[in-house]
Amino acid sequence: MSRIGNKEIQVPDSVNVQIQDKNFIVVTGPQGKLEYQFNHKIKILLINTIIKVSRPNNELFMKKIHGTTRALLSNMIEGVEKGFVKRLEIVGLDYKVDLQGDNLILHLGFSHSIKITIPKGIDIEIPKKIKGIHIKGIDKQFVGEFASKIAKLRKPEPYKGKGIRFEGQYVIRKAGKSTKK
């Protein structure tokens, strides 16, 4: 039994959900518009402002996709209503981040700077008080993938903790070399 799949989704007044043929769903809201094609075997019903997701049988595949479908729908509704933000922290003395048009320029201690093109649907904000990057968008998966792509450029090293990490991420530290006595 999927506990997540059986929960109902409450649709806010500011969000419009359209269920078209073969479970093609369009969700529009104040932040933007998202579209997704769900598995056609899953039943998705919109009753007034409540969405119910149900499966036709108890096969293993249907059990797996039931909760996933409900979670994706919930994320779509939350994304077009409020949006999602991933925050990255940059730890290191000479590490810098610049925003030039549609490009993100990262200076991460390499002999060259790294230039990343910002995709459509992603907004980037560089706060002034802390060294970091705020990645915003309406698609939770897309925002997370882009943030992960940036974080992989310079993973935090265990001795000084220098690198790019997600906000609140704990880095396991190691002791340095000890001298002989």
Curated annotation (Swiss-Prot):
InterPro entries in the cross-refs: Ribosomal_uL6-like (IPR000702), Ribosomal_uL6-like_a/b-dom_sf (IPR036789), Ribosomal_uL6_a/b-dom (IPR020040), Ribosomal_uL6_bac-type (IPR019906), Ribosomal_uL6_CS (IPR002358)
Gene3D superfamilies: Ribosomal protein L6, alpha-beta domain (3.90.930.12)
GO cellular component labels: cytosolic large ribosomal subunit
Keywords on record: Ribonucleoprotein, Ribosomal protein, RNA-binding, rRNA-binding
GO biological process terms, semicolon-separated: cytoplasmic translation
Keyword tRNA processing attached: no
Pfam families given in the database record: Ribosomal_L6 (PF00347)
Keyword Ribonucleoprotein (UniProt): yes
Alphabetical list of SUPFAM superfamilies matching this protein: Ribosomal protein L6
Any GO MF annotation of the entry: rRNA binding
Entry-linked NCBIfam families: L6_bact (TIGR03654)
Family the UniProt entry places it in: Belongs to the universal ribosomal protein uL6 family.
Function noted in UniProt: This protein binds to the 23S rRNA, and is important in its secondary structure. It is located near the subunit interface in the base of the L7/L12 stalk, and near the tRNA binding site of the peptidyltransferase center.
Subunit field text: Part of the 50S ribosomal subunit.
Protein name per Swiss-Prot or TrEMBL: Large ribosomal subunit protein uL6
Organism: Phytoplasma mali (strain AT)
Species classification: Bacteria, Bacillati, Mycoplasmatota, Mollicutes, Acholeplasmatales
Gene: rplF
